[in-house]
Amino acid sequence: MQTETRSHPRFNHVALTVPGDLLDARGRDEILRFHGEVFGWTEMPTLTRDRELLVLRAWSHEQFVFLAASDSPLRGDGSEHFGLSVATRGELDAMWERAEKLRGADPRVELTERKTDDFKVLQLHSFYVRFLLPIRIEVQCYEWAPGFDDQRMR
């Protein structure tokens, strides 16, 4: 008899509306260059439609950022974001350094300083970055104290 394995649902994509002009050849190239260099994302080229659609593959075909053109695109006030979790502080620092290097070449890159929030059992390292998209991306690394982890906190 086969036992059923249960897993939690997980987020698999973020969909955002953007101005159609951002999805022209130049805009797509800029979006792909930045997000590719900082996060390692790639284009799903079979889905790309000029001035209509760009899908950024985020490490697997089941994780992606879906950018669709709209006459009324999303406009954030600065607090809207989605989060990425990395396994190590080194990964977080490397992403921040790549974003910082690109900010030096392009002032449109918005990047916060890295910070650490101390929750005693958890050191939460993070930064925010945004380039051309209507919302920011928060990169986080959870550094648990000995004897603690995300499972123990349930």
List PLM regions with ranges:
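Core segments of cupin and vicinal oxygen chelate
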Residues: 16-63
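Conserved N-terminal glycine/acidic-rich loop preference
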Residues: 3-13, 21, 54-57, 69
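Vicinal oxygen chelate
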Residues: 1-24, 74-100, 102-154
